[in-house]
Structure formats: structure tokens, C-alpha cells
């Protein structure tokens, strides 16, 4: 699971 589920898919892509 992602640590930032509240972020948009684009934001998670930067992570």
C-alpha cells in the first residue's frame, strides 16, 4: 500500500 493514498496518481508517480 502507498504511504500517501490521499495523493493523486500523478503525485504518487513522482514519489
Swiss-Prot record:
Keyword Zinc: no
Keywords for this protein: Allergen, Glycolysis, Lyase
GO biological process: glycolytic process
Molecular function in Gene Ontology: fructose-bisphosphate aldolase activity
Enzymatic reactions: beta-D-fructose 1,6-bisphosphate = D-glyceraldehyde 3-phosphate + dihydroxyacetone phosphate
E.C. number(s) listed in UniProt: 4.1.2.13
EC category name: lyase
Keyword Lyase annotated: yes
Pathway(s) of this molecule: Carbohydrate degradation; glycolysis; D-glyceraldehyde 3-phosphate and glycerone phosphate from D-glucose: step 4/4
Further comment found in the protein's record: In vertebrates, three forms of this ubiquitous glycolytic enzyme are found, aldolase A in muscle, aldolase B in liver and aldolase C in brain.
Function description: Plays a key role in glycolysis and gluconeogenesis.
Summary of subunit composition and partner proteins: Tetramer.
Membership in a protein family: Belongs to the class I fructose-bisphosphate aldolase family.
Annotated protein name in UniProt: Fructose-bisphosphate aldolase A
Gene: ALDOA
Amino acid at each position: 500500500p502507498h504511504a500517501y493514498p490521499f495523493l493523486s496518481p500523478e503525485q504518487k508517480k513522482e514519489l
